[in-house]
Curated annotation (Swiss-Prot):
Transmembrane segments: none annotated. Belongs to the NadD family. The keyword Transferase applies. Its EC number is 2.7.7.18. It holds the Pfam family CTP_transf_like. InterPro entries: Cyt_trans-like, NadD/NMNAT, Rossmann-like_a/b/a_fold. Keywords: ATP-binding, NAD, Nucleotide-binding, Nucleotidyltransferase, Pyridine nucleotide biosynthesis, Transferase. It catalyses: nicotinate beta-D-ribonucleotide + ATP + H(+) = deamido-NAD(+) + diphosphate. One of its GO terms (molecular function) is ATP binding. It comes from Fusobacterium nucleatum subsp. nucleatum (strain ATCC 25586 / DSM 15643 / BCRC 10681 / CIP 101130 / JCM 8532 / KCTC 2640 / LMG 13131 / VPI 4355). SUPFAM superfamilies: Nucleotidylyl transferase. It is an enzyme of class 2 (transferase). GO terms for biological process: NAD biosynthetic process. This is Probable nicotinate-nucleotide adenylyltransferase.
Amino acid sequence: MKIAIYGGSFNPMHIGHEKIVDYVLKNLDMDKIIIIPVGIPSHRENNLEQSDTRLKICKEIFKNNKKVEVSDIEIKAEGKSYTYDTLLKLIEIYGKDNEFFEIIGEDSLKNLKTWRNYKELLNLCKFIVFRRKDDKNIEIDNEFLNNKNIIILENEYYNISSTEIRNKVKNKEDISGLVNKKVKKLIEKEYID
């Protein structure tokens, strides 16, 4: 089975995130995508709140998609969330006979060498990297450009910002078209202050 893992803050999840999931399902022949809202990020100060809300939004968006699972594996974990640790848990749950993929943005690939056990990660899974549509200036290390376990997609990266959405909600601006209409009211209620 081909399993893609899509971790992130999803603070909140928006249409751009959904389009990436749709693209991977339709074009890369995945059997399953596991959406994992981060618990405590390892790469920045913990300014994430509303874990339950972020999880609820993701679940609501994908509740009718049998190929998408939303997991609380990192939210329930103690301490900082590391992709390496999460992947090992998922391999234990689903079995090592499956093929695992990690979905990331080009900015994450640029910093991959700072990730915990990144070389071992590259042996345990393949990385699906979405390039940003408007930013071709990010330099990618040759080690990654020539690695068979890194798939760089020159596909449009759906450039919507969760920060932009939170700011619009705080300023009582319309977020239609930026978030799934199924969760628009929930986002407006939960992110108002």
